[in-house]
C-alpha cells in the first residue's frame, strides 16, 4: 500500500511530514500517474517507483534549504518543487519550464491539492527575468552544473545559493564549474528504497 510505504520511507529519511501533507503527496503521485498516460511527463510508470524516484528523491533535499523563496528550473512535472512545496507551506516556489503541457499539469496539481505557495511559469530559463532574486535556485536532472550556473546566474538574490541535485559525480562535471562560482558543500543524500548515488551540490557566486 502506497500510504504505508510513504509513511515508512519518510520515517527512514528522518522527515517530519504531517498526515495532510502525506495525503497531498499521494494525491500528487495519483495525478502524475493519470496525466502521464496521455502527456508522457516521466519515464517512470509505476506509482510505487514514482514515490521513491520522484517524491522521496525530492524531499530529502528539504532539510538543506535555506531561505523562503525558491525557483525550480527545468522542473518538468514539478520535481522537486511540488513535493518540497507540500512539506514547506511557509516557503514559496516558482516552477519554471519551457513546455506548456508540463505547466498545465502543475497548475492542475496546484488547484486540486490547494497549494497556494507555488506558481508556474512557462519560459526558457535564460529568458526569465524575475522582479526579485531568489534565496535558492534548484535544479534536478536539468543540465550539467556548468550549464545550470551559466543559464541561471541572474536568478539568485545577493546572498542566494544554487542547489544542484545530482546522481554520481564525475570529475569532468565538477571541473566544469565556471569562474565566478564557488562550490561550498557537497552533501551525500540517502533516499529510502534507492541504491543509486544521490548528491546535493550547494554553490554560490564567488
UniProtKB/Swiss-Prot annotation:
It catalyses: guanosine(527) in 16S rRNA + S-adenosyl-L-methionine = N(7)-methylguanosine(527) in 16S rRNA + S-adenosyl-L-homocysteine. Its EC number is 2.1.1.170. It is found in: Cytoplasm. It comes from the Bacteria. S-adenosyl-L-methionine binds at residues 74, 79, 125-126, 140. GO terms for cellular component: cytosol. Keywords: Cytoplasm, Methyltransferase, rRNA processing, S-adenosyl-L-methionine, Transferase. SUPFAM superfamilies: S-adenosyl-L-methionine-dependent methyltransferases. InterPro entries: rRNA_ssu_MeTfrase_G, SAM-dependent_MTases_sf. One of its GO terms (molecular function) is rRNA (guanine-N7-)-methyltransferase activity. Specifically methylates the N7 position of guanine in position 527 of 16S rRNA. HAMAP family: 16SrRNA_methyltr_G. PANTHER family: S-ADENOSYL-L-METHIONINE-DEPENDENT METHYLTRANSFERASES SUPERFAMILY PROTEIN (PTHR31760:SF0). Belongs to the methyltransferase superfamily. RNA methyltransferase RsmG family. This is Ribosomal RNA small subunit methyltransferase G. The gene is rsmG.
Amino acid at each position: 500500500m502506497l500510504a504505508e510505504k510513504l509513511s515508512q520511507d519518510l520515517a527512514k529519511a528522518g522527515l517530519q511530514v504531517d498526515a495532510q501533507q502525506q495525503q497531498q503527496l499521494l494525491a500528487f503521485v495519483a495525478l502524475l500517474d493519470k496525466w502521464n498516460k496521455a502527456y508522457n511527463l516521466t519515464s517512470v510508470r509505476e506509482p510505487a517507483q514514482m514515490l521513491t524516484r520522484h517524491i522521496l528523491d525530492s524531499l530529502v533535499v528539504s532539510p538543506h534549504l535555506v531561505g523562503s523563496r525558491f525557483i525550480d528550473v527545468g522542473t518538468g512535472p514539478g520535481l522537486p518543487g511540488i513535493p518540497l512545496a507540500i512539506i514547506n507551506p511557509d516557503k514559496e516556489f516558482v516552477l519554471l519550464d519551457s513546455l506548456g503541457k508540463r505547466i498545465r499539469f502543475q497548475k492542475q496539481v496546484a488547484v486540486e491539492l490547494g497549494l497556494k505557495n507555488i506558481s508556474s511559469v512557462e519560459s526558457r530559463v535564460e529568458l526569465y527575468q524575475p522582479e526579485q532574486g531568489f534565496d535558492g535556485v534548484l535544479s534536478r536532472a536539468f543540465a550539467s552544473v556548468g550549464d545550470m550556473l551559466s543559464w541561471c546566474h541572474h536568478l539568485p538574490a545577493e546572498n542566494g545559493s544554487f542547489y544542484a541535485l545530482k546522481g554520481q559525480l564525475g570529475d569532468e562535471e565538477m571541473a566544469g564549474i565556471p569562474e565566478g562560482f564557488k562550490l561550498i558543500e557537497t552533501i551525500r543524500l540517502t533516499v529510502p528504497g534507492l541504491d543509486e548515488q544521490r548528491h546535493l551540490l550547494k554553490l554560490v557566486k564567488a
